[in-house]
UniProtKB/Swiss-Prot annotation:
Tagged with keyword Acetylation: yes
Domain of life (superkingdom): Viruses
Family membership noted in the UniProt record: Belongs to the cucumovirus capsid protein family.
Name the record gives this protein: Capsid protein
Biased composition (Basic residues): 11-21
Organism expressing this protein natively: Cucumber mosaic virus (strain CS) (CMV)
Length: 218
């Protein structure tokens, strides 16, 4: 072997990787990467249809109509026995009701389940006579007549079901802020007794902008 061959052989020996410094990807590593990719795709799919737990407003769902803003109120139903009903009239703040002729375009209700929620509830909003005492019998009849959309909200293992909003359009009725006291949010507890620490309802009333309102949400 001449000198050049000896030098080349020595260089090749130096280039040989040290044992244990690198190894081919194992089957377990490959399976882990595939599983990670699948979980990532699944999380993206779920997140696309999963509502947030943040306070729901038209800011979070869609823009207000031009020239409109919204007023939000929160309702926390009391204990409702299994198969029974609860109703609460929409009472807006005085700073809003003094502009009682401003038109209302729609009402949005969002169901926010609390940690202990494990029931099925039906939620709707209805215009009710001023004389109505919102008794169980009266509310039961309103749910049965089919005159208003109803949101059926059920316990979901993820914490919140995909469809947790009810949008009630009033634009064709020419309803105004003064009419809101004639409307009520109604809740039916179907399968179990609903406890006081299981559910919160967020209600957004979209109405024409009033002088005390700020800029429209974006």
């Amino acid at each position: 072997m001449d000198k050049s061959e000896s030098t080349s052989a020595g260089r090749n020996r130096r280039r040989r990787p040290r044992r244990g410094s690198r190894s081919a990807p194992s089957s377990a590593d490959a399976n882990f990467r595939v599983l990670s990719q699948q979980l990532s795709r699944l999380n993206k799919t779920l997140a696309a249809g999963r509502p947030t737990i943040n306070h729901p407003t038209f800011v979070g769902s869609e823009r207000c109509k031009p020239g409109y803003t919204f007023t939000s109120i929160t309702l926390k139903p009391p204990k409702i026995d299994r198969g029974s009903y609860y109703g609460k009239r929409l009472l807006l703040p005085d700073s809003v009701t003094e502009y009682d002729k401003k038109l209302v375009s729609r009402i949005q209700i969002r169901v926010n389940p609390l940690r202990k929620f494990d029931s099925t509830v039906w939620v709707t909003v209805r215009k009710v006579p001023a004389s109505s005492d919102l008794s169980v019998a009266a509310i039961s009849a309103m749910f049965a007549d089919g005159a208003s959309p109803v949101l059926v909200y059920q316990y979901a293992a993820s914490g919140v079901q995909a469809n947790n909003k009810l949008l009630y359009d009033l634009s064709a009725m020419r309803a105004d802020i003064g009419d809101m006291r004639k409307y009520a949010v109604l809740v039916y507890s179907k399968d179990d007794a609903l406890e006081t620490d299981e559910l919160v309802l967020h209600v957004d009333v979209e109405h024409q902008r009033i002088p005390t309102s700020g800029v429209l949400p974006v």
